[in-house]
Amino acid sequence: KADKASTEALSKRGESHLAPRTFNMTIGGLEKALLKEIPAEDAEKWDRTGLLVGERSLPVTRVAVALDATPGAVAAAAEAGASVLLTHHPAFLEAPDAFAPEASALESPGAVVWAAIRNQVALMDFHTALDVSPAAARVLPGMLGLKFTLRFAEPLEGSRRKGYGQICEVPDNDGEPEALARLAARCMAVF
């Protein structure tokens, strides 16, 4: 959150870091930009990466982000005015058997596709390609104040810079071991 003093100072200069940025980008342009940073070639062969549902030529209005594509996440994206729902996990791995809204509490992949089309929200994901991304591998350790070591629990075959499960070092605490309670508190603060 911006504090009031900095917002007022920017307003006096005629600037505002809170002003909405405008840009022209299509859904296909967004996908292309993300695939440049998170290459589809890094994804597991069984995974789906990139645009799953949507029209590449349509403009991006806003982008909503969620872990999973669910009918509720699609509805929230649409309500927020987003034309894209960017998720970690794909809406489906195998093609759905049917595309229809679900009346039950169980959410089927077909119901997600139905909701996306009905609400005109494109679905895009980068699952395992993001899991092994060098840039993404540094985000959580950075948030938790851990040192990234460029070592992985499961390195990606043929790569020294990519893999699953980054191994991190806990920073030195004036010669004292890191207390589990302090590390847990950092996790709670971040998440």
Kindly label every feature range from the protein language model.
Residues 4, 10-13, 17-191:
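Hydrophobic structural segments
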